[in-house]
Amino acid sequence: MIKVQTKWLERAQRIRAIAQAGLAFSKDVYDRERYEELMKLSAEMMADYSEKDIEVITDLWQGEKGYPTPKADVRGAVFRENQILLVREKHDELWSLPGGFCEIGLSPAENVVKEIKEESGYDTEPSRLLAVLDSHKHSHPPQPYHYYKIFIACSMTDGQGETGIETNHAAFFPEDRLPPLSPKRNTPSQLSMLFDFLRHPDKKTIFD
């Protein structure tokens, strides 16, 4: 059932992408009307196969203009004494790697340093790109957007554990005692991948 649900969500995202691109470039009034109808249809499909109301989805998509592309989500892998840094999100009390959407004007490396500082209080320095993964190819729950997830290894340089606007705890965990994870942000297999990089420093970058 999950695979069927995911496939329909991917189709809804694809229909929405085609419609949004059409609205960005088409001047024909009739074509634009058809693209608007496709946008509504894709929102209805998304609502049917996700946990979000159609109004929420419509609001999320309202400001999206131009040619659609996947969103970039960057996550920092910070280790200390063979334990990985995780932060707990306030709104669901689940744990994730520090990170978030890439902001315009900042590189992925600059973004991850900023996110780690804001969410955990630690100053870090990016050292290596570990992986670039497609959210559709991993066991994330259904979501309205398509993401490329960027994992960057970072070394701690200063600071102490502090919480941010979106987080209420930051702590280091060993691989065999991980807390409840936020599956839309990171999966158990992705955490295992990062610990594997720790054990094998010469491991090649992984990408989908």
UniProtKB/Swiss-Prot annotation:
The keyword Metal-binding applies. GO terms for molecular function: hydrolase activity; metal ion binding. Keywords: Hydrolase, Magnesium, Manganese, Metal-binding. A motif (Nudix box) lies at residues 100-121. It comes from the Bacteria. Mg(2+) binds at residues 115, 119. Its EC number is 3.6.1.-. PROSITE patterns: NUDIX. Its cofactor is Mg(2+); Mn(2+). It is an enzyme of class 3 (hydrolase). Disulfide bonds: none annotated. The keyword rRNA-binding does not apply. CDD domains: NUDIX_CDP-Chase_like. It holds the Pfam family Nudix_N. Disruption phenotype: Cells lacking this gene have an unchanged spontaneous mutation frequency, even in triple mutT/yjhB/yvcI disruptions. InterPro entries: NUDIX_hydrolase-like_dom_sf, NUDIX_hydrolase_dom. Residues 69-195 form the Nudix hydrolase domain. Probably mediates the hydrolysis of some nucleoside diphosphate derivatives. Belongs to the Nudix hydrolase family. This is Putative ADP-ribose pyrophosphatase YjhB. It comes from Bacillus subtilis (strain 168). The gene is yjhB.
